[in-house]
Amino acid sequence: MENAYILGGLRSYVGVVNGIYRHIPAEVLGAEVLKQVMEKYQLREPDYIVAGNGVGAGGNIARLMALTAGVDISVPAFTVDVQCGSGLESIAVAAAKINSGEADVIIAGGFESSSTQPRRGYNPNHPDYTGDEWYSVAKFMPGIHRETVMLEGAELAAKREGITKEEMDSWVLRSHALATQAREQGLLQNIIAPVCGAVKDEGIRPRMSQRLLDRMPKVLEGGEFITAANSCLINDGAAFVVLCSQKYLQEHGLKAQARVLGSTACGGDPLVSPRTAITALQKLLAKHGLQEQDIADFELNEAFAVIDVLFARSFPHSVDKYNVFGGALAYGHPYGASGGIITLHLLEALKQKGGHYGAASVAAAGGVGTALLLERVE
């Protein structure tokens, strides 16, 4: 089996919904980052482009994004939709194609524009149509599992697991503090592609305080735990990495940052989806015969502070090596892009701290978790 390596990659600054990227369609935002990745790594015609997207307009929006970037029409591009896990699963799919020998170099990651999220017109014959409205946003989890599954899932998870708002608030403060530190010290500057006029990650709040958290209203009617602060922002952004084979490295005289050791996914209760990030991570480590202490850095997409608490309870000796640059509570969560973002953050953490193994995981709408294991190339 051919080894799959990651050369590196770039991400945009993360914008808040209706923020700096408010008029930028998803395919344009993704294309701008993709162009910079191709230029940095001198790629004219990769074998594939694999991109995650959660709420894109139209079929196979990754192909539209690639063509918008000026990628040659001979290069195939396809979209992966695992909602929040789309970007990470795209990287896993790309690695598998390289493992199989089908491809030598692939650009993978994801992109999202919540600001330009498409609306859906109701068909009068559809059972959801009541005659009260003609349009709604595209649904994450239609049917029996209801629309607001992620917020409800976080609320339900907090109740089931006995998680308090105070526990979650401590993670909100940590995330913003670490993200502020990373910004002020330029710790992530090497992976930023400044596009479309953005100059910073818009969600980071340097002055986040307990006083502000105490004033936050609950977001669900009758809810006890979930607020706008301990759940992620709604965001726009894009992130891509370049994966390649050993042969490609040798032919081009390149050195990779990391080897992709493997990936896995799991299913769980769609109404308590946050736990799937932990389950996928545990499954991944067991699959590779690794223990908590073997992992130098963990990156999880903290869509909700519930996930942070679950991680700390499941991996109690790893809190200080978890989301070391802050997480989605500060940066935000541009659904399809988030897997690429946390992979890039993981690569930077391994490089800056000299760690050997790193693991990333995402919980996705619908009750799916996906996880990725990396080994730093020394």
Segments from the language model and where they lie:
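Condensing-enzyme catalytic core mediating Claisen C-C bond formation in acyl metabolism
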Residues: 1-26, 159, 211-274, 279, ...
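N-terminal extracellular/periplasmic Venus flytrap/periplasmic-binding protein-like
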Residues: 11, 23-32, 167-251, 314, ...
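Conserved beta-ketoacyl condensing-enzyme motif
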Residues: 22-85, 89-93, 97-98, 103-105, ...
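Short, well-ordered amphipathic alpha-helical segments that serve as non-catalytic structural scaffolds
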Residues: 26-41, 61-65, 90, 150-157, ...
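Phosphate/pyrophosphate-binding loops at sites that engage ATP/ADP/AMP, CoA/4′-phosphopantetheine
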Residues: 35-47, 157, 161-162, 249-256, ...
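Conserved catalytic cysteine-centered active-site region
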Residues: 53-103, 144-149, 207-233, 314-342, ...
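Active-site-proximal alpha-helical scaffold in enzymes
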Residues: 82-112, 158-187, 241-247, 334-355, ...
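Active-site pocket-lining segment
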Residues: 155, 261-330
